[in-house]
Amino acid sequence: MGTHKQLEVWKNAMELAKIIYKKTAEFPKEELFCLTSQIRRAVVSIPANISEGSGRLQPKEFIYFLRISFGSLTELETLLIIALELDYLDKKDYEKIQNQIKLITVQLSRLISVIRNKVELSSHH
């Protein structure tokens, strides 16, 4: 499959992590070990699991790690809604981040489908 660094979904997840780190640096300091920390852990998990999965030998293992990335992405969405409702994020920044999340969601879904189809094809031969 190649290295994870060649995957557009990984590149976009890395970009999302940078955006999130910059935005959460503006959150109130009392949130550093609470919401800020949870958001950062969730966003870092996305590209980290993509890279870990791509390093596995079995395609089914790769799919497993992509699904973990997907779960972290949905967790991130909820945490960002909380940040928005607490006025830690403004609507414009939230929408920009949401667009990146939507892109990564589509890319993860497609990659999982492509790998699943390859697994099914190889099992029929």
Regions found by a protein language model. Give the residues of each.
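Short, C-terminally biased terminal segments at protein or domain edges
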Residues: 1-125
